[in-house]
Amino acid sequence: MTKSELIERLVMKYPQLRAQDVEDTVKLMIERICHTLEKGDRVEIRGFGSFSLHYRESRQGRNPKTGESVRVPAKSIPYFRAGKELRERVDEEINQ
């Protein structure tokens, strides 16, 4: 599901809400999560999951085109860990 599809589905499910308000809210939520991660903080949405940063050390890599060794710099990457409730719901739905 894309962000646009999420907005469409929310508008269909809640017709009393204006489409622009739904779009603004979804964009604002995503922006706040990104901003919090940029500060190095963790975001937890109970029952859904948590967003955090995982640090990756600098390492030796290889350019797939040329085969040349290159140094990959250290970096922090966003990481999502599904919460228990979400994992159980998905598992239950798939195993029916």
Swiss-Prot record:
Alphabetic keyword roster: DNA recombination, DNA-binding, Transcription, Transcription regulation, Translation regulation
SUPFAM superfamilies with a match to the protein in the record: IHF-like DNA-binding proteins
Listed SMART domains: BHL (SM00411)
UniProt keyword annotation of Transcription present: yes
Superkingdom: Bacteria
UniProt record, GO biological process: DNA recombination; regulation of DNA-templated transcription; regulation of translation
GO cellular component terms, semicolon-separated: chromosome; cytosol
Gene3D superfamilies: IHF-like DNA-binding proteins (4.10.520.10)
PROSITE patterns given in the database record: HISTONE_LIKE
Keyword Secreted appears in the UniProt entry: no
GO MF terms, alphabetically ordered: DNA binding; structural constituent of chromatin
Protein family according to the UniProt entry: Belongs to the bacterial histone-like protein family.
Function of the protein: This protein is one of the two subunits of integration host factor, a specific DNA-binding protein that functions in genetic recombination as well as in transcriptional and translational control.
Record's subunit section: Heterodimer of an alpha and a beta chain.
Protein name: Integration host factor subunit beta
Source organism (scientific name): Dichelobacter nodosus (strain VCS1703A)
Lineage: Bacteria, Pseudomonadati, Pseudomonadota, Gammaproteobacteria, Cardiobacteriales
